[in-house]
Amino acid sequence: MIKKFKENYSIILLFSIILFFHQYIFQQFFPNNRGYIGHDWEIFLPYLMFGKIWFHNNLLSIPWFSPSFCCGNPFFADPQTMYYSLQQIIYLIFDPLISTKIFFFILSVFGYLGTFLLIKKGFKFNNYVSLLCAGLFLFNGFFVYRAIAGHVAYLSYVFIPLYCYFLIISYEKKTNHIYLALSALLFANFFHSGSGPIILIIFTSILFVILLYSHFTNDFKIFLKLFQSSIIGTLISSSKISASLFFLSNFPRQYPATEFDSLVAFIKTFFLSFFITPNQNYFNESLTSMFPFGLHEMEYSVSIVPIILIFFISKKFFTLNFYNIRFILILFIIIFIPIFLNINFFNQFQIISKIPILNSTWVQFRWMAVYILPIIIISGLIIQNLNIELKKKKYLVLILVSLLLVQNLIKDNGWHLNDQKYSIQNAINFSEKLKQGISQEIIGPAVILDKSGTPKKSDNKNDMFFFSYSPLMCNQAIFGYGLENLKTKKITFNSKKILQDNSAMYFSNKLDEKDGNFMFFNPSCFLFPEENNCKPGDTFTILDKEKLIKFSSYEKFEFKQNKFQIITNYVSIFSFIICLLYLIYHFFIFIYNIRKKY
């Protein structure tokens, strides 16, 4: 009893120490000492602040459109928006600065604890090995440096271990469907938290984890449970998925996919990015791309620990038998997929460019993220199978944890600090206005031009809505990185204001008329043009004046949807309610049994 208490105490202490150092190292980026956060927060922080206004005015009603960006555009249908998500709840409660810190902390805990539970309860490794694996995942660069850069849509990646844990437990406890319901909700969360752009990477990562679990347990029936979970989760999020697909179909885009020059370049980049530190110059020189990438894009670090563990591989892994051959085949599949998508060996990129969804993604090296969890699981497997006494295993884990912490403590993060260019102050000031109960309304469209008359380069394009104007030159990748698919010429400006830096702000009132149309896009035309008798990029007509006034005041307005979207709306809400009621029912049963027992 005392021995078990001491071990649990040691695990909790070590667990807390690892988490403390993680937060100590990375909370300094939220914000940095100049009050800035990562550049892509420019997109997502305004999204979350819009969600705050929408909730105040409309509670849980679907935010189909937003007047805050692009002079009116679809919001719910954007795969990267996240109104029904954990992060939106956090930003509803706290001010932007505190919310950003809490958000990073909560995601860290979910990823950390989820991995510990997955390795401990799912893969049945001991406490210390599970803790090391959890630590490796906590510090992985794909999570940490995407959070710093503001790639908020990618951060739901951290829920993969927790999802896999729920799925495995639901399979092992076949009569208990609580974990299946939890896994389905978590699967739906991948869509609703804005992870649409990397949903294939997330699902492939899940497949790899479950494939390794099936191999170790010599039982592949869990894939039926994965099918059930993903189907229920897809039903819950079917409204979001359907709307996103309709939006994307109206604005198809295909950019040339990134491609490594050779297998050697891919392997070298992988090795440096995962185990040492990325080489930005080498990466960009060996990659064919539309433009060079920042250091944050090549950060996947799981530390040098997995490399060290190679020297501890047990001889039994080299025995030629069916079990090991199957394991090698699984590893080959895991290794091959990112290589296949990054190096055009067989001219397969032509085929990939014709595959729906896959052809809309072009930054293919992000597929390296699917390596993270297999590397961590195999690292744990190596230690778990060491033929040494448990005490020595504990000491080995402590040494490896120390290496993990030291490597992250001494790492030069200067580039990431200097790359943070988005000021959070506008959002903080806007949040104060909301607290004071000041009603919000968009006055009209606006754009800022520099002295040469071209759109001014800015790190806070979407912030304009904090000042009651909707930016025409917004940050919305669906319209193209240069907004080439947005009919910007339909918006004209009647007023001009010279700013302090001699740039000029051109703006109009939304009710200014031109040829029977107002100066604001009708967002329903971007999403359901046929049903609303218009074309993508059409503006509100003078007959739609009441709709425009409601829309610009963050109120719902009437528009038509196609039949399939209406069906998926009902499917989503009923699936969610059934799942939620099932969990609530079992929660009350659980409470009742506790009270009855004591």
Residue spans for each PLM region:
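Periplasmic/ER-lumenal interhelical loops and adjacent helix-loop junctions
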Residues: P46-F50, H56, I236-S314, I438-S439, ...
